[in-house]
Amino acid sequence: MNKYTKPLNTTSLVNTYKAARKRLFLFDYDGTLTPIVNNPADAQPTSALLHCLQLLCKDPANTTWVISGRDQLFLDTYLGSKIPRLGLSAEHGSFMKKADIYDWTDMLKDADMSWKEKALAIFEKYTQSNPGTVIEQKKSSITWHYRNASDIQKTYVCVCVYMCF
């Protein structure tokens, strides 16, 4: 038995795509549609990416979504305002915006977010003592970026933060 994924049969894929009456495309943003970069603000969509998404969204048989850890403003600015019929999911599903709808739906409107204060205090402690690390606050989450820290710091800090939680 082969334990590896078989190569994609592109002929079969194209035939299945053409025969389908409805198609669903779900794309992640960072690391999928755009490469992982040292500064998250630099991960802006290319004109080629926007063109591909526009082509997918123009086909009425397609339902296309971008699901991201990015916030609503970023997704609206770089994708939603440029591509009709594109659904958006911000902050890993915390906020949803159906295609061609102006308003976002807050999926966490009744959630207890009191945990953020304690988590932020822990992240601030480690950020101060670890050069190259930064805190990114969003409405529904706090992300601690350590990709620009040294490799030794990354390992040490990950273990320390894990022990805190």
Regions found by a protein language model. Give the residues of each.
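Short loop/turn segments at strand-loop or loop-helix junctions that form parts
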Residues: 27-32, 91-93, 99, 138-139, ...
